[in-house]
Amino acid sequence: MSDTYERPRRRPPKKPNYKPLIAVMAAVLAILSVVAIAISVPGCTPRQNDPTLQSTTTPTTGPTTSAPTTVPTTVPTTIPTEPPVVKIGTATVAATGDILMHMPCVRPGKQADGSYDFAPYFAHVQDYVLSADYAVANLETTLAGTDGGYPYSGYPNFNCPDGIVTSLKNAGFDMLLTANNHTYDTQTLGFFRTQQVIAENGMDHIGTKPDAESDSYKIVEINGIRIGMINYTYETHSDPNKVDLNGGADLKENEKTLINVFLKDDVEGFKTDLAEKLADMRADGAEAIVLYIHWGEEYQTKHNSQQKKMAQAACDLGVDVIVGGHPHVIQPMELLESETDPTHKTVCLYSTGNALSNQRIAEMRLKTGHTEDGILFSFSFAKYSDGTVRVENVELLPTWVNLYTSKQTGKKVYDILPLDDQIEDWKTQFELTDSTLTQAEKSYDRTMKIVGEGLQTVQNYLASLPPVA
């Protein structure tokens, strides 16, 4: 037997099965691809501060540290404030008493060429007049000239040379009052010519007007303050269709509406008429009102009940200052309170007396000397940035007419003296004799006895008002 060795046949090795591994790897790659795609697509990246995501986060069981909270910064809000109220202007008005041109006052003014000049009468008071922003005087005479049949004359029918207006203007006066009981002393001629002469001298006037179309008042703008001024006089006729001045001078039909008048016993009628005119003045821009009024009883140093009622009516209508005339003597000053508006007050000087006249003690039945006394009444208005206008200050300067004969000309001089208590030596300042110095001192005392208390009341009230820069 043959030995033959047959190696046993080896089975080929079993190939590894990679299919499961490939499947797993494919699955992993698929997952990674999805994640990669998610990351690469805008808007799909998780936001750390997304409140929606945060709300789905499972809280940990351990202690956590809160992230610092950012508090938003608040920007302060600026609250607008009103600008402070400040004074933006003042206006001072001066008013003097009656310019009552008796013939003894007229004659010394005549010059060699026939013209008239009364400048020496105002020489000492001129600086005080000029210190005001605006000055007013009551012209108690007419200016009819002499060509129309009227001579120059004094009481009872006054007609004065035109030179009195020129002299008043040169002394610093800006306005003349033309409504008084002597307005019609030279009838129609004097009524209109007086207004014409005043206008030709570049001065204002109130109380009368040249035609129906003209205003019955004047709005004067002084340092940016619009001050309304109006002038009334009493009349003596009860007939509503007539106007009678001085007890016998009936104005013609076409003239009766050209003067501001009132009946003494008709306070309501006066109030109604004044209210209408004040409404017009305010519509024209008046920010303050001054009433100049010819009223009262001659030679009475105390105002009467009718004056009191009329003053109260004017106060109730909002008038700021009342300047009275006609009695030819000084009457008291008073502070009135409105009965319709307790916040409104009115300063009232019932009479400024005589600025210039021949009513001397020697000529008068009244021997007290009061007819020789006058006042330069100064009052100031202040205007503020909020539009308010109010009376700010009031001053009274007593005046006295010193009658003497000039050594240079030999003529009489009616010298209006400002009795300023700041002047230590009146005798030297005004070249007075011992006798005339005594008279001046008595005049000052008479005046202050009448107005001193009321003046103090007014000044105390004004001083009590809240100060404004």
Regions found by a protein language model. Give the residues of each.
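Short, low-complexity, disordered segments immediately C-terminal to signal peptides
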Residues: T45-A67
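Acidic, metal/ion-coordinating pockets
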Residues: D3-E6, V24-A27, I31, A36, ...
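N-terminal Lys/Arg-rich, disordered targeting/topogenic segments
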Residues: M1-P20
